Amino acid sequence: MVRNNIEVDVKVKCIEAGLTQAQVAEMIGTSSPYVNRIIKKQDGIVNKTFVQMLEALGYDIEIVYIKR
């Protein structure tokens, strides 16, 4: 189970950076509709595009595992 909402995190980071999803898409060499589809995807976006989006926004990704 993912404990945070990565889709919302990407949207918030775009807002904080003053960038649109279209601008992020251009930064990573993909289309705006593709970025939008990935962000809204029901089963999450933890894939290469997710990593590229956060790196384009100036972030490293840290995954924390918590024992249940």
Annotated model-derived regions:
Residues 10, 21, 32, 47-50:
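Helix-turn-helix DNA-binding elements, focusing on the entry/boundary residues of the two helices
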Residues 23-25:
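Short alpha-helical "recognition helix" segments of helix-turn-helix
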Residues 29-44:
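Recognition helix of helix-turn-helix/homeodomain-like DNA-binding domains
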Residues 48-63:
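DNA major-groove recognition helix of helix-turn-helix/homeodomain DNA-binding modules
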Residues 1-17:
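A short, Lys/Arg-rich alpha-helix, primarily the initiator
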Residues 16, 27, 56:
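Residues within the alpha-helical elements of helix-turn-helix
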Residues 65-68:
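Short amphipathic recognition helices of helix-turn-helix/homeodomain-type DNA-binding modules
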